[in-house]
């Protein structure tokens, strides 16, 4: 690409054909576009002057002065203007006017970086798309960067595995993370720092963690990152639901092998994303299950409240979703879309433009979930409110039911950490409390604080007080049947 741009400018200079065309570099990764621009300018023996479009004067007189000064400097110092328009707001008419004037009046060499094609300028513009690197290109970048990393490790070069194992490790990184060349370099640099401080250093783990960190900045601004230390042991579910979650995990881990190595993607490129629905009442473990998957897969988990993404303005919901998915793709994070009911209502007859656009919003979300190179999860408290036509496009649908007495007893047994002091807890009696796991965890935590404040181990009386507080918060009545025998001395065996 850099060679093509350089040849284009060279041909224009050789022909003395007047004002050179503006070069547009369109794509998601600003640093890759900057790298290309710098290579072009080096080949063309020009220096680069970078400028954010937001630094442009908005006053007409100031802008005219800026243009005159730039024209003089670009000629005297043989400079190319590299204009960063990646975060240009198309609705900012004042800035758009200044930008248009600059591009039309400056006669020298200009390169624009942008996410979407720039239009409406009365001057020739040639667009070059800068997509994210293909997996093979990413693999080459990884190999080159790891070779540099090995040189930096000095006496720790033994941390770099043999060629065959290293190739497998890098293929795993390429399959999970869609990083640009510059992000791969940064990940390797960060991994060196980790390896020098770890007591049991592992190059694979250091690179994996660095990749997760590289992808966070953009997504942290758009969604809530949930930290999770949960494991399969923290889940109490019926066997069928447990098996479904394990299948989801397998689909994420083996995605590259099945689609690329085994060739299933060649049959059909559609629907390669892993889209799931977790349905069930509040507190039944939907978010907890997502946390378990994230921890087991060593991936970040981001929670997005769909109610806050949906906009009353036509087209804005899709833009909000686009920003989230675009930011998430490089890191392969697990996306948890909460409150699916707010957008996935049953499809009704299209009577007006609002109905039509509402269906478009749903279709757009499903399309992005299906093409997302990772796991995207929807949650709902009421599956019956969702249109079956939409559900058919999801790969997994898992029901999270209210736990029965046996499952509640298991939850009570696991809810207290091994280091928490307890005394005389009757788990079968506690299981009489007809409440979901989320509320059980709240009660256990509150009981621990009550016991700690009293200087005692957690006992049934503390759990009773915590239960009364929890039920009052929920506006529920605590029946005598549910707490029967809780504070009877005969319970303490």
Residue ranges and their predicted role:
Residues 89-99:
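Conserved phosphotransfer microenvironments
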Residues 77-80:
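Short acidic/histidine-rich motifs immediately flanking catalytic phosphotransfer sites
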Residues 83-84, 338:
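Walker B catalytic carboxylates
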Residues 1-63, 69-72, 103-493:
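AAA+ P-loop ATPase motor domain of ring mechanoenzymes
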